[in-house]
Amino acid sequence: MSPAPRAYDVSLPTHAVGVLEWGPADGPLVVALHGFPDTAQTWRRVAPLLADAGWRVAAPYLRGYAPSGIPTDGGCSVRALVADARALHGLLGGDGRAVLLGHDWGAITTNAVAGDPASPYARHVALSVPPFPAMNPSPRTLGTWAGAMVRQPLHSWYIAFNQVPGLAERDFHRLAARLWRQWSPGYDATEDLAHLRDAVPDREHARTVVSYYRALLGPGITPALAEPVHPLLLLHGDRDRCLEPGLARLAGATTVGGAGHFVQLEQPEKVAASVLSFLS
C-alpha cells in the first residue's frame, strides 16, 4: 500500500489551498494539478512512484474543490488558474528544477504556463488535453483532423451543458459519475467519486467548479491560446472518450495504451515511467 500523503494548507490572496504531498521534504518539486470532475487524490497512484525517484509531489485542490476555498474574486478562468500555478511554485518551495504536471483542467493550466516565457517551472507535463493551438490542422493532417472532429462532438456535449446556469450544479454528482463512465470505459471510479463528494459537498462548490467552463467564453481564456515555449511532455490514453486520441496524436502526444481519460489512475506505472524519462 502506498504511504498516505501529508496534508496541509497554503494561502493565496483569493483563497486557501489544500495540498496533498508525497516524497522527501528536500526533493525537487512537482506541482500536480487535477482536473474536472476530480480531486488531488487523482495523483495517489503516480505520486508515490515519482516520490520513490526522489521527487516531492505537491498536489493542490483547485479553486472550488474543498478543502481549498471558493475564491473571493469568483475567478475560474484559465488566467486565474495560471496565476495560482505560478504562485504555488513559490509558496511550495519550488526552485529552478520544479516541474508542473497537470491532467484535464490541470493540463489546460499547464499548457498555458508552458506558453509563458516567464514560467517559473523548468519542465511541464500535460495529460489528456494537449495545447489548444497544437490541435489545429495543417494541410498534411487535415484528413485525420476531420475524422477526429466528426467524433469529438459526441464527447463534448457536457461543455454546452455546463454553460446553462443552475443546470449542472443541480445534480452535479450524477453528472460527474456519468462523465467518469463515459471518459474511462471499464474503470471503477468508486473511490474517486467518494473523494469528489467530499470536495464538492454543496451547490456553491458545484457552481464554482462548473464555472471553469462558463469562463471559457470570456477574455480569461487568452493564456490557453499561446504556443508552448518550454519543454512539454504530452501523454494521452488510447481509449480516451473525452478528447479524441486522434487529436492528441496530431498535437504530438505520446499514446498510453490501455487507458481512457484518467490515464494517471488507469496506467500509473506507464505514466510515471514516461514522466521520469522526460525529467531525466
Give short role names for the model-derived ranges.
Residues 1-29, 52-55, 280:
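Alpha/beta-hydrolase fold catalytic core
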Residues 2-6, 14-17, 41-42, 58, ...:
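Flexible "cap/lid" subdomain of the alpha/beta-hydrolase fold that forms the substrate-access gate
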